[in-house]
Structures are given as structure tokens and as C-alpha cells.
């Protein structure tokens, strides 16, 4: 499309702002004139995918967003759910993918800072952080640098700001080479009587700029996050923000103190698009306008022009609307905390964002044009799966080498099941993430109940602060998890997305928590590619269906598109479609929770859900498995199909068993199947297990041992509860359970044998602990 006549900008200048020619023409039509440079930049960031979700918004409308416990849903800085007893939890997930690819330390660190501001802007004190990280192969030196930098950035910011990082997930796959994913989730406990909203109101009310100074760092970060990565992106370090966690700590305390005064009408974090986003969103949500004078903004650099003020993404900054006459009360609070606070503008009746600079008008745009009436693309999705998936789905286990009770029969010789198990445990995706979480302060605030690596979900004690700074005694807790097997989503976006929701709910159930609500982070490639858009659309359909069925409404989230790297020929290399599901759950009694490790010698071991005899069927399969990828270097097959009705039954049984005190340990069967779940329970509890499997109807033993699928939980139960427990299982699950064996002595071995007493796996606790525990360190030191 050609540009309108007399356009003062070249096509290159317009596209540099992330705008298409037709979008520029729409801007001219709405304004009735050509924009100036500052206004062009404002439209560029606010009409970016990162800010306005122009490709994904139609798909997000299918998500369930209402529920009995939902107090705040999508549209605010964070979702809020009711925990009972007067407690309310704010939670949200955000991505910082592109910045972390260019500057891993600061990119990841400021991702933490940004999500924390979303939480305390609502009036909640941050109590926990989790992260979902994706990298390429650790055999690649650049991946090792990115991995180390990202983990260092997260630990630096979280540790300094005093918020514990309590859980998460880390995956490694060549699909993320050059385009890592850094998704950070934060939880906060509401401290204010009223939830702080972001819509401005009250004509004449003062608008306060508070926090840090404004500089040139983070220029155009929102537009940068809405484009593909290339070699040239390495020069985009100015688009990466620089954070100060100690200043953010002061900002948290000052904001929470300010909110409690009742003098704050509305508040908004200055995140993506900085002043532009905060002014336009606050004005648009309130149906009013904001008149702001840039000359009043505290700066850290001289000679800045309006374009730079408006697009800067300097960190640790907020915009407040105060009740007229009470602004000094707020300013005094921020000054006492060593922070900037100035009246920089006012609320006006005309619904526009008016920016003043050096006595003139630098920009004047209808607020809704920037924040609400943004472009929307209704793209046509593919009517059938792409050809590469049809080829992948044609794969069957018949293509694998033959196997026997002793192992795989490879051309190079036999690989025993012991060795297969050890190789899988040493896969960085399955292996211990201790190298990661030992860098995090996961016990600051002293409310972390289960340490990272000890259970399938993080558990945090709820201890709200009272007016005198004492802590209220509450025996309830909150559990949180982040989950997504992106290989499943790549092979079947609809089923894979459903599986992510199901696994998140299952992980919460394994610690005894009732799943409440979801925040999601949709990490996908370009929606302008038909396959990319089809993956996004199918995944959203799967997420929506699973959330409805499991009664876990979506309270908000983040969309990160254009996650692909341009190779030297300019051909995009997309990541796996990765819809990360963050889910929170309520634990009524912290005395009734579970970890994943065996607790007592002699306990009976049960598998709840899909029985092992179904291995190789649609719900439990080798398709898309870690075994297939790691041992056979194959990404193919149909991933497990999700039985949501059975999921609900199995999870309810697990939660009830934990609350009754019947279950001593519970662990989700995920990557690596039943064999890996058994090994991980042995490692966590440092106890062995004797397992007997009926192999009579199994065509391949690798399907029995390593097939993956949902609705499967491994639990241990004391021997004296056997009769009561099995009676309950038969009543609730009918045939969807089986007794597998018994927990053995400390530091013994994991012994898996067939029902006719043939040994399949026999490894010591030391062997599996070493393979699992040192894998990542060994890769990093190679």
C-alpha cells in the first residue's frame, strides 16, 4: 500500500516504528493530519503487538474469565482472586523474551521488576516469584552464556528486592536457539482495603510521576518485542531496560503506604511504552484525558526530546492520579523513601492525551486511539493441519529398534533399561535444576513451605501484615505452578495446550491445593505466517476448553509473538509454540500438604489414573516424549490426548487423600513417564522402591516404562491405611488405579521387575542421584 500524500516520513521511518503503511494511513485519518515524530512513536509502541494484541485479541475472547473466586479479571495490571478469611491474592505472568536474547542479565532482571510492579500497583505485597525458562541446547556456547546470564539476572533482582523465587520450570531444546523464553510470574497478597485500579477519574485531579528518573534506556522496547530477532538485534541493547532492585524495594513500600492513605484515585506502572502507555491507558479506562508536562519529569540525561521522554522504558516508575488537595501527602511519602514524586499533569475532561514540552504542545492524541480502538486483525486459520504435522503423526513405535526385557537392541549393541533411565535423568530438561534455584533466595520473607525441587508445585504460607507491621496468623497457604510441554503443543497445538492446563492443575493437586485460576503467557512465532497463526488459534481453543472444564478461569496474562530468529538468509526459524500456564491454588491447612519424595519405608506405591496396561493408547503414548527425543533424536507421533473428566476425578482423589492424611507423597507422571516419576520420588526421599509391572499385554517395554500422558499421579500410602484407601479408590476411580509396589530402605535401590520376576531396571539411589543431580553442571563446565 502506498503512503498518503505529503507524508513527512519515509516508508523506512514508518516501518522502523513497527507500523505498516496501512496503519499509518489509519493514523492520518483518525488525527485528520499527519502525526509529528513524537506522535508517530506513540502510535508505534501502542499499536505494537506487545501492547495492543492486534493479532491475538479475537482469540483471547474465548477464554473463561469469570468465577466464584475471581475479583479482578483481564484488563487490569494483575488478576485477583478471593482466598477466603479476608485474604485476596494478586497474580500475573509476563514475558521478557527479546530483551533477554540481546542482554540476558538486564533483560531477565527487568522482567522480574516489571511483573512485581504489576502486582504491587494493585495494592498487593509481592510474596513469591516463579519463572518458566526455555533455551537451546547446552552444547551450544551461546546458549550457555544466555542461560547463565538469565539466571543471574533473575536471582540478582529477586534477591535484592526481597521476594523469594520459589519455583518454575526450565526446558532445553534446539527450537529455542537464539530466541530464549523468559516468563516470570509473581504473586502478591492484598494489603489495601480496596483493590487499586488504573482508570483515571476526577476532572482536575493531579497526575503524579513517582519513582526513578527518566533516561534513554529501553527506547522502543515494546516495538522491539514485537519483531523477529536477527543478527542486527544484537545491536539493539538500547532497547533493553536497566533495573535497580533496591530502588524498587523502596518503591514497593512507598506505594503500599501511599495506597493505605486513601489519597490515590488510580495507579499505573510505567512498563512497556513508558509514559505513553501509562497516560493513554489510564485516560482511556477512565473515559477522561490527561494533560502532562514533560518539563516537570525528573530526568537522568540532558537534552532529551519528547520522542525520547515518551518512549523511554526506564524502570521503577509509576503514574498516580491523586485526589485534589491530597497530592502533597503522597509526595511526602515518596520523598521519605528517597524517591522522586512530582505533580506532572492533571486529569482533563476532553478524552485526549496532551503532552506539553518547553511551552508548546508536543503531542495531542485521543486516548482511545492509543489504548482501546487499536488495529485488530481477524486472520483466517488453516482449515486442516499443515503437512509437516501429518507426516509427524504418521510415525508409530514400529519405527523404533526392537527391545526386550533387558533393553533396546541397537545397531551399536544393546542399551539396557538401566542405561536408558540414567540417560533420561541426565537430560537437562529432566535433570535437577539445583544449579538454577540455588542462586535464588527462595526463603526470604520466611514463608516458603516447600523448597524448590521438593514438590510438584511451590507452596507459600499466607501471613498478611497488620497495621502495626505484625503478621496475622493464618494456617492456610497458596500453591503456584508454571507448566507447558511445548513439544506436545508443536505436535498438536490443541491437545498440547489442554495438556498444559491439565498438568498445572495436577501439579497443584499433588501438593493438596485446590486449583483456582490461571494466568497464561502465549509465546508464539509470527501470526502473519499461516502456520504460526493456526498454532496460536488452536492452542487458544485448547486452553479455553481445558480452563472451562477444570473451572480455572483466566484472570489475565501476556502474549509474546514474533518469537523467531532470522537465519543468515533471512528465513525465520520459529520457536515451538509455547503457551505457558501459570495456575494458583488454595491450601486450606498447611499441615496437610505433600512433597514428591517417599517418606516412610514400607509405604505402598500406587498409580492413580490411566493404568499402565493402557500404555501405547491415545492417552499414554511415546509420541512427543522425552524418551523419543533424547534416546532416539526423534520429534514425532501424536502427543497424549487429554481426558479432562478423568483428570478431575484423579486430582480430586489425590487432594482428598492428602487432606485425610492417607497420602504420604504425590508426584505427577510427566516427562519420562512412570520410570522417571519413580526415580524422582526415590531421589527426593532418598529411599528405594520395589515395583512389579504386568508386562503380559505390552508390545513394547519402552512404552510401559517411558510413555507419557496425563491423569496419572504416583502416590505412597502407609500400609495400615491400605484397606480404607483401596476401598476409597475403587469407589471413586473404579479401575483407574493400581498398586505398583512398596517403598524400601534409605539409600537402597529402585528395582522394577516384571510380574514373572524378570528384572527390568535395578539402579542404586546413588547412581540415579548422580546422573540427575550433576547433569547441568557437567554441561556448563564442558
Curated annotation (Swiss-Prot):
Binding locations of Mg(2+) 2: 118, 269
Annotated Mg(2+) 1 binding sites: 94, 558
Molecular function per GO: ATP binding; magnesium ion binding; phosphoribosylformylglycinamidine synthase activity
SS bonds (residue pairs): none
Repeat listed as a keyword: no
Localization in the cell: Cytoplasm
UniProt KW keywords: ATP-binding, Cytoplasm, Ligase, Magnesium, Metal-binding, Nucleotide-binding, Purine biosynthesis
Active site: 50, 96
GO cellular component: cytoplasm
EC number of this enzyme: 6.3.5.3
Leading EC class: ligase
A single GO BP: 'de novo' IMP biosynthetic process
Binding site for ATP: 53, 92, 520, 557
Family, as annotated: Belongs to the FGAMS family.
Function, as annotated: Part of the phosphoribosylformylglycinamidine synthase complex involved in the purines biosynthetic pathway. Catalyzes the ATP-dependent conversion of formylglycinamide ribonucleotide (FGAR) and glutamine to yield formylglycinamidine ribonucleotide (FGAM) and glutamate. The FGAM synthase complex is composed of three subunits. PurQ produces an ammonia molecule by converting glutamine to glutamate. PurL transfers the ammonia molecule to FGAR to form FGAM in an ATP-dependent manner.
HAMAP family xref list: PurL_2
Protein name as annotated: Phosphoribosylformylglycinamidine synthase subunit PurL
UniProt source species: Cyanothece sp. (strain PCC 7425 / ATCC 29141)
Gene transcribed to yield this protein: purL
Amino acid at each position: 500500500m502506498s503512503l498518503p500524500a505529503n507524508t513527512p516520513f519515509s516508508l523506512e521511518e514508518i516501518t522502523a516504528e513497527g507500523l505498516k503503511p496501512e496503519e499509518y494511513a489509519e493514523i492520518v485519518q483518525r488525527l485528520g493530519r499527519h502525526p509529528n515524530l513524537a506522535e508517530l512513536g506513540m502510535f508505534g509502541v501502542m499499536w505494537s503487538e506487545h501492547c495492543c494484541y492486534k493479532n491475538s485479541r479475537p482469540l483471547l475472547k474465548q477464554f473463561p474469565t469469570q468465577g466464584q473466586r475471581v475479583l479482578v479479571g483481564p484488563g487490569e495490571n494483575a488478576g485477583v482472586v478471593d482466598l477466603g478469611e479476608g485474604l485476596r491474592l494478586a497474580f500475573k505472568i509476563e514475558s521478557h523474551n527479546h530483551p533477554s536474547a540481546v542482554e540476558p542479565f538486564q533483560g531477565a532482571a527487568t522482567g522480574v521488576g516489571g511483573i512485581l510492579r504489576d502486582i504491587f500497583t494493585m495494592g498487593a505485597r509481592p510474596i513469591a516469584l516463579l519463572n518458566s525458562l526455555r533455551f537451546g541446547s547446552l552444547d551450544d556456547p551461546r546458549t550457555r552464556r544466555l542461560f547463565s546470564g538469565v539466571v543471574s539476572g533473575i536471582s540478582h533482582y529477586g534477591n535484592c528486592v526481597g521476594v523469594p523465587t520459589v519455583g518454575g520450570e526450565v526446558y532445553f531444546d534446539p527450537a529455542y536457539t537464539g530466541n530464549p523464553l523468559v516468563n516470570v510470574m509473581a504473586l502478591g497478597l492484598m494489603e489495601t482495603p480496596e483493590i487499586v485500579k488504573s482508570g483515571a477519574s476526577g476532572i482536575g485531579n493531579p497526575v503524579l510521576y513517582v519513582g526513578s528518573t527518566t533516561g534513554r534506556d529501553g527506547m522502543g522496547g515494546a516495538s522491539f518485542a514485537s519483531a523477529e530477532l536477527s543478527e542486527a538485534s544484537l545491536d539493539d541493547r538500547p532497547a533493553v531496560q536497566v533495573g535497580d532492585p533496591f530502588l524498587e524495594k523502596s518503591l514497593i513500600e512507598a506505594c503500599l503506604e501511599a495506597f493505605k492513605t486513601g489519597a490515590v484515585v488510580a495507579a499505573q506502572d510505567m512498563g512497556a511504552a513508558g509514559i505513553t502507555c501509562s497516560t493513554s491507558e489510564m485516560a482511556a479506562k477512565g473515559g477522561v484525558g490527561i494533560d502532562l508536562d514533560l518539563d516537570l519529569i525528573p530526568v537522568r540525561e540532558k537534552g532529551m526530546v519528547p520522542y525520547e521522554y515518551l518512549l523511554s522504558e526506564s524502570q521503577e516508575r509509576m503514574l498516580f492520579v491523586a485526589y485534589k488537595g491530597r497530592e502533597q501527602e503522597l509526595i511526602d511519602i515518596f520523598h521519605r523513601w528517597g524517591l522522586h514524586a512530582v505533580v506532572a499533569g492533571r486529569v482533563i475532561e476532553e478524552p485526549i492525551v496532551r503532552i506539553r514540552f518547553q511551552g508548546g504542545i508536543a503531542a495531542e492524541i485521543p486516548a482511545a486511539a492509543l489504548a482501546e480502538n487499536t488495529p485488530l486483525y481477524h486472520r483466517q486459520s488453516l482449515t486442516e493441519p499443515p503437512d509437516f504435522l501429518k507426516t509427524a503423526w504418521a510415525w508409530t513405535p514400529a519405527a523404533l529398534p526392537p527391545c526386550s526385557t533387558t533393553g533396546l537392541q541397537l545397531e551399536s549393541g544393546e542399551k539396557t533399561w538401566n542405561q536408558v533411565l540414567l540417560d533420561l535423568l541426565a537430560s537437562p530438561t529432566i535433570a535437577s535444576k539445583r544449579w538454577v534455584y540455588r542462586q535464588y533466595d527462595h526463603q526470604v520473607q520466611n514463608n516458603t513451605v516447600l523448597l524448590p525441587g521438593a514438590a510438584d508445585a511451590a507452596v507459600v504460607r499466607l501471613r498478611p501484615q497488620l497495621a502495626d507491621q505484625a503478621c496475622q496468623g493464618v494456617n492456610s497457604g497458596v500453591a503456584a505452578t508454571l507448566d507447558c510441554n511445548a513439544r506436545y503443543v508443536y505436535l498438536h497445538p490443541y491437545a498440547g495446550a489442554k495438556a498444559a492446563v491439565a498438568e498445572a492443575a495436577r501439579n497443584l493437586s499433588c501438593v493438596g491445593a485446590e486449583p483456582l485460576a490461571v494466568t497464561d503467557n502465549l509465546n508464539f512465532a509470527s501470526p502473519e505466517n499461516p502456520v504460526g497463526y493456526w498454532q496460536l488459534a488452536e492452542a487458544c481453543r485448547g486452553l479455553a476448553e481445558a480452563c472451562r472444564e477444570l473451572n480455572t478461569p483466566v484472570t489475565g496474562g501476556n502474549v509474546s509473538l514474533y518469537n523467531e530468529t532470522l537465519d543468515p538468509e533471512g528465513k525465520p526459524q520459529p520457536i515451538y509454540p509455547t503457551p505457558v500456564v501459570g495456575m494458583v491454588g488454595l491450601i486450606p491447612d498447611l499441615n496437610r500438604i505433600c512433597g514428591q519424595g517417599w517418606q516412610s519405608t514400607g509405604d505402598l506405591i500406587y498409580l492413580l489414573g490411566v493404568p499402565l496396561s493402557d500404555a501405547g493408547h491415545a492417552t499414554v503414548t511415546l509420541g512427543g516424549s522425552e524418551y523419543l527425543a533424547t534416546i532416539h533424536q526423534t520429534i514425532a507421533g501424536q502427543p497424549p490426548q487429554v481426558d479432562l473428566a478423568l483428570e478431575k476425578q484423579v486430582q480430586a482423589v489425590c487432594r482428598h487423600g492428602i487432606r485425610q492424611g492417607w497420602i504420604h507423597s504425590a508426584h505427577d507422571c510427566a516427562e519420562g513417564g512412570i520410570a522417571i516419576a519413580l526415580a524422582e520420588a526415590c531421589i527426593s526421599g532418598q529411599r528405594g522402591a520395589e515395583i512389579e509391572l504386568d508386562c503380559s499385554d505390552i508390545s513394547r517395554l519402552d512404552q510401559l516404562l517411558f510413555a507419557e500422558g496425563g491423569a496419572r499421579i504416583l502416590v505412597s500410602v502407609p500400609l495400615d491405611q491400605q484397606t480404607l484407601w483401596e476401598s476409597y479408590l475403587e469407589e471413586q476411580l473404579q479401575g483407574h488405579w493400581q498398586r505398583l509396589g512398596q517403598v524400601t530402605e534409605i539409600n537402597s535401590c529402585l528395582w522394577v521387575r516384571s510380574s514373572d520376576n524378570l528384572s527390568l531396571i535395578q539402579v542404586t539411589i546413588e547412581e540415579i542421584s548422580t546422573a540427575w543431580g550433576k547433569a547441568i553442571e557437567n554441561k556448563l563446565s564442558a
